[in-house]
Amino acid sequence: MRLGNRPEDIRTCVHLRWHIHGLLRQENASVVISKCLRHGAWRLLLWLLLLATWDVGSGQLHYSVPEEAKHGTFVGRIAQDLGLELAELVPRLFRVVSKDRGDLLEVNLQNGILFVNSRIDREELCGQNAECSIHLEVIVDRPLQVFHVEVEVRDINDNPPIFSVAEQKILVAESRLLDSRFPLEGASDADVGENSMLTYKLSSNEFFILDIVNKRGKGKFPVLVLRKLIDREENPQLKLLLTATDGGKPEFTGSVSLLIQVLDVNDNAPVFDRSVYEVKMYENQENKTLVIWLNATDSDEGINKEVEYSFSSLASSIIRQKFLINEKTGEIKINGAIDFEESNNYEIHVDATDKGYPPMVAHCTVLVEILDENDNAPEIVLTSLSLPVKEDAPLGSVIALISVSDKDSGVNGQVTCSLTNHVPFKLVSTFKNYYSLVLDSALDRETTADYKVVVTARDGGSPSLWATASVSVEVADVNDNAPAFAHPEYTVFVKENNPPGVHIFTVLAVDADAQENALVSYSLVERRVGERLLSSYVSVHAESGKVFALQPLDHEELELLQFQVSARDAGVPALGSNVTLQVFVQDENDNPPTLLGHQSGGPAGEFSQLVSRSVGAGHVVSKVRAVDADSGYNAWLSYELHPTVGARSPFRVGLYTGEISMTRALDESDLPRQRLLVLVKDHGEPMLIATATVLVSLVENGQVPKASSQGLPNSSRREASLMDVNVYLIIAICAVSSLLVLTLLLYTALRCSAVPMQAGCGLGKPTLVCSSAVGTWSYSQQRQQRVCSGEGPPKTDLMAFSPSLTPCPVAEVGMESHSVGGDVPGKPRQPNPDWRYSASLRAGMHSSVHLEEAGILRAGPGGPDQQWPTVSSATPEPEAGEVSPPVGAGVNSNSWTFKYGPGNPKQSGPGELPDKFIIPGSPAIISIRQEPANNQIDKSDFITFGKKEETKKKKKKKKGNKTQEKKEKGNSTTDNSDQ
């Protein structure tokens, strides 16, 4: 076959034209030309050569690349085809510009090759167009040249055939004729050419075949052709599968499900289950009673299946009067009275007709047999009702009388009576068809307030008939339940200083009875609280049970108010119960710190102190003492200097001890008189502050009064007596297990030696010193115990606590003073009547024993022995071990507390009593000092217990005989142990 002017020959040579420039540069260009010559296409070849020459002159190139080519796929040597050298691509600014997407193709400037840069999707780029090309413009400068490049994108088979829906529904009537055609929706393929040429295939079946219809310009479409009639009653629907395959390599397929719905025609008549139905029924049935429910079925569907029922034309008028038929459901019901004596059988003819066209009819016969029955039920009559019934009624009490009757005769007239189960009653037969309803078990209204008693009378007929009568038995209440509280006692917390009449709690008692028996009233169980009646503190509302505080409560006066509230009902006799209320009065910080005494003669909280200029750092100058009537953290006191004192001041105050000590040695620049303001703060909210003013006068060495040296021998004896204090401490710790036996022995010895010692010991002044770091204690009852030593004067400065004893006179308490020549008067004072125990001290006091009775101090030849750990009082700072938080601040007040402090500069010498000891169960440190009664300088670091203590009177100086007595006794004045 020769190559001529046919369209396919022209397409072949046009394709050669696109690549003519590449072919001329390759070795097989001559082969192509010779091929064209052999086929005699001289004119076409000449035209192609001219066209190629024109393309080279105009700078247009043609390439082709398949779609979906990978990145880097070779397209053509564009630089070589344009006649450009590789070395001049960069200098001449070689660049490629695309009118379409510019990132699909790219040129490597190193080798001048055009390659695929990103994925090319022909369907996305050109859609269903037969030709798809990418147009590029190649621009170079020096001189400026523009080349046009056309890259054809060849289609590949990368898209399967797709149907628009997953399932196609086709409606086919079962009466359709053979060869009926049903067009289907074809598939589409996004590819072009052979890749989009589709062929269809239908799944095998006996009813349909597939035919392909060629529509001009629209492709091929599948059509279903009916080859066999379909019976809807056998095959209501068919499911087929239509598959489309494209012509690409490899080929792709797509499928769609065909759902064929077969439409019904009226070709079936209704059918009854049976042609004759037999029914038996009793007489006297209620109107509209169902006789029979007929059912006729039709194999068709839709309106052809709907059936209507009716009496046949053969039915008599009596049948139409006595019975009704529902034309939709086929129910035959009674329309009047059916009496066995009137007729014992009926014959009913019924038709069933469908709604199809033409309508079809079915027939049946219903034979109804009437049976005689027991058609009279028993009758019940209730008389002589005795209601309501008290819940304490005795067993056997008659509640009601019952009579029964039945109009029937024989076995149908024999009646028996019964009650419902689980009721506390029973029936007692008194005569034929007469019964009594009596109480069978005890009643409890709180469990069940009323009973519904159902009396059932049943005859002996078959079937048996019965009648029922209800009796509502109400149980009358008896006051047999006392009011009950949910809990036996309640705990209430009330802050002190509450407003009068404030509601603090509500009690609630519930009475299980009813009406007035359940009406509860509340009242206080009166008693005395101290010197006052309980009703002066609280009251309770009689109806609501609300408890009110009638006056402001004071924690310092009353920490716990325990009382009972009584609840009584209004029954006869009245019943009641009590509940206990424990009202804890919570402390508030309503008491500021109170400074203890002053000795300077100035206003309260102000005193003077003489200090030698030669004292060094750490020397204790004085001590500020204060108490707080509150408890817990509200009574935990701390001391600090007022900021106005200045950083240059040589003084400082212990944070928790109140000791004023030197921070450095004094120099000439220090003023001779300095005024120190000490702030005493508690830890409450809000914080309350007291201010103490200390007037310090700096004097020379000779002007400071010095203690007499006569006390040195006595001091040596004390040092010798207590040389082994640490040994005693270790022994005391190790011998805890034998402490009880030792206590009993010491107690007996002390009691036996108490009487002789009274004659040989002078009356001294007891001084109990507290160096507590945590605030104050409340006042506790105390008694004076005197312990005598065989070597020295009687020691009367030991004191034991005993809550069971009456309070003894307490020595005056004041601020420390270093004035010379002052004697403390021996006149005792009665304690402040406001003093009382605090919660923290009571916890400690109950866990302590009297020092004498518990054997804590033991008198011996060398003086009393110490049986507890000791701490020196000379340590000026809190870190020396004196700081102890208050009870309630995280410290167990019922445990022994051993306190040690680093760097204690003062140690007890032999024969001395330790400066301080710790009472078990107490957070404070007790100091015991052995001093003569005529000591010139009062060192009474006395702990006061109480709400507020008046500032003590100034101590008067004593002269004359007392001074002479001091010399005779050989007692010397000692320095203040706090300094």
From Swiss-Prot:
Chain positions carrying an annotated carbohydrate: N287, N295, N578
SUPFAM superfamilies cross-referenced by the UniProt entry: Cadherin-like
Membrane side Cytoplasmic: residue ranges: 748-979
Entry-linked InterPro entries: Cadherin-like_dom, Cadherin-like_sf, Cadherin_CBD, Cadherin_CS, Cadherin_N, Protocadherin/Cadherin-CA
Keyword set, alphabetical order: Calcium, Cell adhesion, Cell membrane, Glycoprotein, Membrane, Repeat, Signal, Transmembrane, Transmembrane helix
The protein, known as: Protocadherin alpha-9
PANTHER family, per database record: CADHERIN-87A, PROTOCADHERIN ALPHA-10
Signal peptide range: 1-59
Pfam family, one: Cadherin_2
Primary location class: membrane
More details: The protocadherins alpha are expressed from a single gene cluster similarly to immunoglobulin and T-cell receptors. The N-terminal region containing the 6 extracellular cadherin domains, unique to each protocadherin alpha, is encoded by one of the large exons found in tandem array within the gene cluster. The C-terminal region, identical to all protocadherins alpha, is encoded by 3 shared exons.
Name of the encoding gene: Pcdha9
GO molecular function, one term: calcium ion binding
